[in-house]
Structure formats: C-alpha cells, structure tokens
C-alpha cells in the first residue's frame, strides 16, 4: 500500500495550476448517457474516481476516448448494459449519478447502493423520492436500486434536505421527462451550476441555475456538445491553506475566485494577505495565523470539504477555534490522527474545539477519507520532523498529482 513521506518545516512558495473539479466532472461525464451523440469534455482531472466512472460508463456501452490534454470524448449511441454493479460502485458514491440519466434515456436502471468515503450515511432516499414523484417504479432488493419507467413525467419536488448529488440526478432525469419539473430546496453549489450549464449546452431547458428553485422543461432529446469543466475550488482552497499554514506565498492559476468567497474570507480572517482576479489568487502569509471559527453548511456558506484543512491551520494558530460540522455526522475522524502529532483538539458531538499549539510533531498517521488525507498531508508539511501518511488511495481519489504540485512549491514529499 502506497504512502507519502514528508519532511516538514518548509515554507511553501511558488505557482500552482489548478485542475478541473472532480465533483463537476463526474456528473458531467454521466450526462453523456442522456444523448446518442458525442459529448466532448475538457479539463477532466486524472483521478481514480474519474477512471472508475469511465470504466463504469464503458461497461454500460459508452464509447470513451481520453487524450493527453485531459479531454474526454463520450458517445452513448447504444446502452448495452443498464446495470451499475456493486464491484464498481462500492469505491465511489458518485456512481449513483448514472441512475437518473439512465432511467430517463433507457427506461430502466439497476444501480448498487453506493460506497465511497466513510464520512456519513449520505442516504439516497431523496433521489428515490424524486424519481418516484416523476413516475418511476422503484424497488430496493439485495443492495440494488431497481428502477423502471416508460417515460418520466415532470413533477414538483421539494427535497427534505439539500443534496448535491440528489439535485444533479433529478435535474438530469428531468431534462428528458414529459412536462416541467420544479426542484425546490435544490443545491446551489458551483458544481451543480456547471452540470446545468453543460446540460443547457446539450439542449436542455433549465432555469433558476444557482438558486434553490430549479425549473426544468423536458425535451424529446439532447445533443452532443463541447464543454470545459470548471476549476476545482476545493483543490484551490487546499493549496491556499497549505501556503498559509507554512507561512508561505502562493499564486494559483486557472482557478475560479467567484466560487471561493467563504474560504477566502476565513483565510483573510486568519491573517493572510490575498489579491485575486477572475482566474487567479495570490496569497502571502506574513505572520503566524490567528484562529478562526467555522461552521460548515451548504454553498454559499463554508464548505464541509474544507473543514479538515482549516482544522490543521487552527492547530498552530494563536487562540482557540470552534469548528461546527453540520453536513456529515462522522467528519472528525482525522482528529485522532492530528492528536498523534501533538494537536490539542476536543470533540463533542458535531463540534471540535481546537487550541493552537507552538507546533506539530511528525508521526505515522493513517488517512480515513479523501479530505482527511489532505489535512494529514498539510499537517505533515508544517510538522517538525518526518510524517508518514498511510492509505493515500483516498488522496488519489480527489487530488491530481498532489505530491508533484507540492514539491514544485518546495515541499519535501515523496511517494513510497
């Protein structure tokens, strides 16, 4: 099993080019199921989850081609297999995103209940409830969702909770439904907007993108298009926190500043000097960080996917920070590993109290999920001595060449 070996204590400095957003690319790849024409997707990151999704789509009959420039062509002229098996779904929760488009286009789907990161139940009941409202017949047997419908019908759907993948699944399904679908309490995340913009480019009729009420007028068919995936706001935030925690200076290229207000506000509150343009961000940390309180919530509030990284920043900050996690119930699993590195953290329910210490100590630590693995890498970068991060397959699910990008900033990090 691969691991990362890090010699800490280096001030990071330099330029980083941000990759395409995994959480936008995955549903956009699934959108290829909605048309028999070719969908060309640019800026697709090279990640394990992307590879798994492409393998799954190929198994369903989608022809794919990936070139050296991270451009992916997908043609779903004929869907030969309407099953997403457990063996492929268990490592990636996003595989549930084939359910809506496959059902809308082919009239049937059999999808395994999802796996992925162990950071909460993340139930799919909102997906099922919405599709049933659109006329689908759904049964769950032996760990699989069995769905069928001659043609989906438009419906008024009020989601009980804000769910990103639920919004995406229902939005894709509604593009080919008969009539108008209204999604209330819809997710507003930029990745949802990116998918919607791709669907619109394919001929979908969607209004309210970026609001909590999305209206989709179904059409008979969608067509192919060229689309470029948005930059990854979580990768952007991770590198900004890495630079801030190390007292460094960083310049992000090919990013999207307008998607990062909550993260940038907290970094400035911590003492970072930040300048930015439409597609670039410059951060410089002149003084030790100040502690910042966080409360995760759906976009545009502070993202849960940045909670663990900011916890690392708070471990060495001046003062005490209170971090409240409202999205997932098990997203403090990295705390135990940070405590092995001399962090002072107390957890009670969905709240963590982080008291800043003079410095972290290198240690052997183990990643438990994608963002926790990133936080442990950041901790190793600022710790005294050597840190070994095990189970980094989690990291490879969401960060493209992270050790290469960090090395270019001066980090002493290698894969073993």
Swiss-Prot record:
EC numbers, comma separated: 2.5.1.7
Single GO MF descriptor: UDP-N-acetylglucosamine 1-carboxyvinyltransferase activity
UniProt record, GO biological process: cell division; cell wall organization; peptidoglycan biosynthetic process; regulation of cell shape; UDP-N-acetylgalactosamine biosynthetic process
Group of enzyme by EC: transferase
Catalytic activity reported: phosphoenolpyruvate + UDP-N-acetyl-alpha-D-glucosamine = UDP-N-acetyl-3-O-(1-carboxyvinyl)-alpha-D-glucosamine + phosphate
Residues given in the record as UDP-N-acetyl-alpha-D-glucosamine binding sites: 93, 122-126, 305, 327
This protein's pathway: Cell wall biogenesis; peptidoglycan biosynthesis
GO cellular component, one term: cytoplasm
CDD domains registered for this protein in UniProt: UdpNAET (cd01555)
InterPro entries: Enolpyruvate_Tfrase_dom, Enolpyruvate_Tfrase_sf, MurA_subfamily, RNA3'P_cycl/enolpyr_Trfase_a/b, UDP_GlcNAc_COvinyl_MurA
Binding site for phosphoenolpyruvate: 22-23
UniProt KW keywords: Cell cycle, Cell division, Cell shape, Cell wall biogenesis/degradation, Cytoplasm, Peptidoglycan synthesis, Pyruvate, Transferase
Pfam families the UniProt entry points to: EPSP_synthase
Active site: 117
Modification 2-(S-cysteinyl)pyruvic acid O-phosphothioketal, positions: 117
Compartment(s): Cytoplasm
Alphabetized PANTHER family for the sequence: UDP-N-ACETYLGLUCOSAMINE 1-CARBOXYVINYLTRANSFERASE
Protein family (similarity comment): Belongs to the EPSP synthase family. MurA subfamily.
Functional description taken from the UniProt entry: Cell wall formation. Adds enolpyruvyl to UDP-N-acetylglucosamine.
Name of protein: UDP-N-acetylglucosamine 1-carboxyvinyltransferase
Organism: Nitrosospira multiformis (strain ATCC 25196 / NCIMB 11849 / C 71)
